[in-house]
Structures are given as structure tokens and as C-alpha cells.
Amino acid sequence: MSVLQVLHIPDERLRKVAKPVEEVNAEIQRIVDDMFETMYAEEGIGLAATQVDIHQRIIVIDVSENRNERLVLINPELLEKSGETGIEEGCLSIPEQRALVPRAEKVKIRALDRDGNPFELEADGLLAICIQHEMDHLVGKLFIDYLSPLKQQRIRQKVEKLDRLNARA
């Protein structure tokens, strides 16, 4: 397994729409494993393949405190959503920035697991929010897209400054 490079805004590759996975095979499973390793190394709770410049409909999530409840969503589809909630969200592609984002309180999805088996899942709370956040990535949408243009600009400037500082280190 390897840790992959996470793209940061304003990288336009984050805006690409991911293509469906045609077959879950050893290559897809390797991508899933690398994505988990990357997500854990970056101390995230979710990662979409788009964020590591792989433009396929793959998401990995682990919102557990012990980091031992892996969830793989291949070709996820949103079936239902209900209620309204919102928390301050962060994103590995928008480091050290957070903002309040409106989300559905509950979701029901259909996806394939790491072995290609179909399943449905009903989620609420942090898991529901994380699923929605990561599914947005698959269509080229970022949490900052929910914010005012001024807030978007401020966040972009902060991330660009942070990336410049990290490049010098």
C-alpha cells in the first residue's frame, strides 16, 4: 500500500466528474487500500478518489474513533435524503479550513463494497454528512461551493499561502 498525494484547491482536477467503476477487480481494490492508507496518514475521516487524482466513483470513509470501521462506497447512488443539519466541515483538499455547510440529516444510499457486492445503507449524523461531502467530490463539488464568493476567495487565499509555506519547508 502507498500514501497518495492529495490535491489541494485551486487544482482544477478536483473539479473533474468521476466515471463509474466498470468492474471491481484487484486494481480497484489496490486503489481502495491506498486511499485508506492516505486518509489515515492525513488524519481524515473520508476520501474520494477525485482527491487523489483518480477519477472513478470510489469513496472510503471511517468516522469511528478507533479508526477500525472502514466503509467502501464504489459507484454510490443517493436514494433518499431527509431532514436538515449542518456542522463545520473540513476537507483534506482544503487544509486547515472549516465552514458550516447545510446537509441532509439522514441519507439512504446504494453502492458496491470492496468486493463488488451491492448493498444499501441508511446513515445519519456524522456518517451521513461525510457521505454527502465525499459524494460531492465525485461530481467536482467542494464544500466551499456552498459558501459566499467572498468566503470562498478568503479560503482559497489561505490555502494557497499555506501551500507556499509548506513548499519552502
From Swiss-Prot:
One of its GO terms (molecular function) is metal ion binding. Pfam families: Pep_deformylase. GO terms for biological process: co-translational protein modification; translation. Keywords: Hydrolase, Iron, Metal-binding, Protein biosynthesis. The active site is at E134. Fe cation binds at C91, H133, H137. Its cofactor is Fe(2+). It catalyses: N-terminal N-formyl-L-methionyl-[peptide] + H2O = N-terminal L-methionyl-[peptide] + formate. Binds 1 Fe(2+) ion. InterPro entries: Peptide_deformylase, Peptide_deformylase_sf. Its EC number is 3.5.1.88. Removes the formyl group from the N-terminal Met of newly synthesized proteins. Requires at least a dipeptide for an efficient rate of reaction. N-terminal L-methionine is a prerequisite for activity but the enzyme has broad specificity at other positions. Belongs to the polypeptide deformylase family. HAMAP family: Pep_deformylase (MF_00163). NCBIfam families: pept_deformyl, PRK00150.1-3. PANTHER family: PEPTIDE DEFORMYLASE. This is Peptide deformylase. It comes from Salmonella arizonae (strain ATCC BAA-731 / CDC346-86 / RSK2980). The gene is def.
